[in-house]
Curated annotation (Swiss-Prot):
Biological process per Gene Ontology, one example term: translation
Matches recorded under SUPFAM superfamilies: Ribosomal protein S10 (SSF54999)
Family: Belongs to the universal ribosomal protein uS10 family.
Quaternary structure annotation from Swiss-Prot or TrEMBL: Part of the 30S ribosomal subunit.
Function: Involved in the binding of tRNA to the ribosomes.
Organism domain of life: Bacteria
Keyword Ribosomal protein listed: yes
Protein name: Small ribosomal subunit protein uS10
Xref: SMART domains: Ribosomal_S10
Matching InterPro entries: Ribosomal_uS10, Ribosomal_uS10_CS, Ribosomal_uS10_dom, Ribosomal_uS10_dom_sf
GO molecular function, one term: tRNA binding
Cellular component, GO annotation: ribonucleoprotein complex; ribosome
Length: 103
């Protein structure tokens, strides 16, 4: 489509899974003749939590946990209807959140 692009944003806790799925999207889009910009790694969001180890006492003894959310961004320009059909047929792995916007 003229002057439109598809922006895909991927979110996952496992960086290997998100990279593998991003590569699959790039290969599928290029196979249909579209131009792909990315995947661009965005800053990793790190959430840290402190919880008490003991249920009753020992406030100084704590467990530190963190969750890392990895993000990837890619733009598909010069796409066709074949590109959208091929992207819709991709199997989405469990653990990857996908946001798709047509701009």
């Amino acid at each position: 489509m003229a002057n439109q692009k598809i922006r895909i944003r991927l979110k996952a806790y496992d960086y290997a899974l998100i990279d593998r799925f991003a590569q699959e999207i790039v290969e599928t889009a290029k196979r249909t003749g579209a131009v792909v910009k990315g995947p661009i790694p965005l800053p990793t969001k790190i959430e840290r939590f402190n919880i008490l180890r003991s249920p009753h006492m020992n406030k100084t003894s704590r467990e530190q946990l963190e969750i890392r959310t990895h993000l990837r961004l890619m733009d598909i320009v010069d796409w066709t209807d074949k590109t959208t059909d091929a992207l819709m047929k991709l199997d989405l792995p469990a653990g990857v959140d996908v946001e798709i916007k047509v701009q």
